[in-house]
Amino acid sequence: MKFVSWNVNGLRACVGKGFEEIFKSLDADFFCLQETKLQPHQITLDTPGYHQFWCSAEKKGYSGTAIFARREPLSVTYGIGIPELDTEGRLITLEYENFYLVTCYTPNSQQELARLPHRLTWDEAFRNYLSALDKSK
């Protein structure tokens, strides 16, 4: 299996710079994107043969993740399961028979560590989330 993970820093701008051609040329089984900065209805991508999964931030034009998967998953989870951490579209989990695929856009602590408490809360919750997934497969 071939996995690709790419922080696109704004998918609309990336599409204007040849994203679809790159996507097709990489021929990945799973293509994970971080920092999409859009709502799924704001873009149409030509990705035949892929299932698309989007997790967008409530705040428009901010963060967001997506996964394009050739194989349909058994289940899909959006977010980490903690409401105060799940408004920024930072995590998608696809479940398959023998594994989970998780794409994550981790929060930045920002200038002068303004969001450090949020980041530390996220880091602990993410570790716990991954640990729980690990125990289930």
Segments the model singles out, each with a brief description of its role:
Residues 116-137:
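A long, amphipathic alpha-helix that forms part
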Residues 26, 71, 97, 136-137:
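Structured helix-beta-strand junction loops
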Residues 5, 18-21, 27-30, 81, ...:
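Glycosyltransferase catalytic domains, chiefly GT-A lineage
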Residues 37, 42-114:
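Structured beta-strand-rich core segments of catalytic domains in phosphoester-bond hydrolases
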Residues 1-46, 57, 62, 78:
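N-terminal, active-site-proximal structural segment of metallo-dependent hydrolase catalytic domains
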